[in-house]
């Protein structure tokens, strides 16, 4: 017999992502529509262990769908990674009458949800990360906003780069995944794209590319560099010393995490939030919501974490073909 869900907890964990508030809003309002109570858990698993738990009503999520960040705040928590911390978290959930938890975050957050599910707390994960690095889904909450933020910033850098006939290296987020760099590289017409998945790049080829473009009369050279490659400032110095072309590095940093979410992030996050509530109400647990082949889906967290994701080779190749 499926476990009856009366009270649903919701938390955000790991790095924040635009659209998390839209997901929280959907969780609260869908749960209320189904006659359930909702408790917001502040600061992720750290807040759960500190019992930073508040009742949430429909009014508490008014006027947040357009806001970046997360009203529940987020934090990383080493204590929760221990068996003792996980057991304590499960006991706190039971103490506060929380029957199920919706966890918005990345792979690490899902591993936490997996542990809670094993301890009798029904859990559903929502993919919330700007990196688009969760294998079970083609969409993650926040990626669309982050990549548009980066694209607009790179457009502005290109303007001044062209005026001064510079080479510009723009470093975007993505330690282990180069999706922001790849998408921006294509969208911004970058001459070179550096991805952590393609770490064996040849700097001499970049130098040759810059020199060839100068001979063709090109007035700028844009290099989009994922933070997993990094070292943009030192790379800029080497390129300038070798080519004689003025080269500047710009690190976009945490601005990519902020800002009002795009329409896509608001709609998809809202849909995922509502679906997570529906899954809990159906008695499901240890599931993660995703988006594949034009539809919203859910997978077993164990299976989702075992999936592998790689940069689309065709997209990478066309990015090189288009970067003349």
Language-model segments: which ranges?
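Phosphate-binding loop/pocket of nucleotide- and phosphate-handling active sites
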Residues: 243, 287-324
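N-terminal phosphate-binding or glycine-rich loops at protein starts, especially the Walker A/P-loop
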Residues: 2-49
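Glycine-rich oxoanion-binding loops at beta->alpha junctions
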Residues: 2, 48-101, 108-109, 141-148, ...
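Short Gly/Thr/Asp-enriched flexible loops that form oxyanion-binding sites at enzyme active sites
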Residues: 22-27, 108-121, 181
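Flexible, glycine/charged-enriched surface loops at secondary-structure junctions
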Residues: 36-42, 160-167, 219-223, 246-252, ...
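Short, acidic/small-residue loops that bind anionic groups at enzyme active sites
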Residues: 39-41, 117-142, 194-198, 251
